[in-house]
Amino acid sequence: MKTIANESFLLDTKVPEPTLRRLPWYLSYVQLLHADGCESVSSTRIARAVGVDASLVAKDLSYVSVDGRTRVGYRVADMVAVLNDFLGFTHHHRAFLFGVGSLGAALLQDSGLRHFGLEIAAGFDVNPDIVDTNINGIPVYHKSRVAELCARERVDIGILTVPIRAAQSMADEMIAAGIKAIWNFTPWRISVPEGVVVQNTSMYAQLAVMFNRMKSLP
């Protein structure tokens, strides 16, 4: 039975999703501190930098193995190591990308994803002008080879960047080929069976939120 996918792509079901969304903010900040040679940081300083309450920072960090000390704070090097590991950025994940249009091609060009543990191993499309080419050293295949290459490469993560009308059918093909987690960049809420994880990242939805918030500006 298919269900509309929850947006959660949780690393640990015991950790609230809002916490998981904030932890990368903390990581980015302490990485800057670490690069500057800072050895310790307080929850108050982290909170001020990312714009949340200090009590919330302390609560969020209680879910991971980061111990703070009274009047000293958290060891920056420990925070960087623990948060990177907890968020999965130190692990190597391989993914296939489906839909090599403007957005898909841009993601293939983004070598920075490797720094967060994600390697895009191949792209898939139906456009004959794109199939059998390489983008940033990444091969692009016809989507008819999805099942073959998923089995051969043992890839179970898919990035979905196809046009909205093709979103559900492409997701179905991905799942049939063995994809277990889908990073969905389309504005369509795809339906998936139980046991398949979906993370929806619609830029259009975020754009609508920004436009709406701008209306309240003086």
Curated annotation (Swiss-Prot):
It is found in: Cytoplasm. Homodimer. This is Redox-sensing transcriptional repressor Rex. Its main location: cytoplasm. It comes from Porphyromonas gingivalis (strain ATCC BAA-308 / W83). GO terms for biological process: negative regulation of DNA-templated transcription; response to redox state. GO terms for molecular function: DNA binding; DNA-binding transcription factor activity. NAD(+) binds at residues 99-104. The keyword ATP-binding does not apply. PANTHER family: REDOX-SENSING TRANSCRIPTIONAL REPRESSOR REX, REDOX-SENSING TRANSCRIPTIONAL REPRESSOR REX 1. Keywords: Cytoplasm, DNA-binding, NAD, Repressor, Transcription, Transcription regulation. Modulates transcription in response to changes in cellular NADH/NAD(+) redox state. Residues 25-64 bind DNA. The keyword NAD applies. The lineage of its organism: Bacteria, Pseudomonadati, Bacteroidota, Bacteroidia, Bacteroidales. Signal peptide: none annotated. GO terms for cellular component: cytoplasm. Belongs to the transcriptional regulatory Rex family. SUPFAM superfamilies: NAD(P)-binding Rossmann-fold domains, Winged helix' DNA-binding domain. It comes from the Bacteria. It holds the Pfam family CoA_binding. InterPro entries: CoA-bd, NAD(P)-bd_dom_sf, Rex_DNA-bd_C_dom, Tscrpt_rep_Rex, WH-like_DNA-bd_sf, WH_DNA-bd_sf.
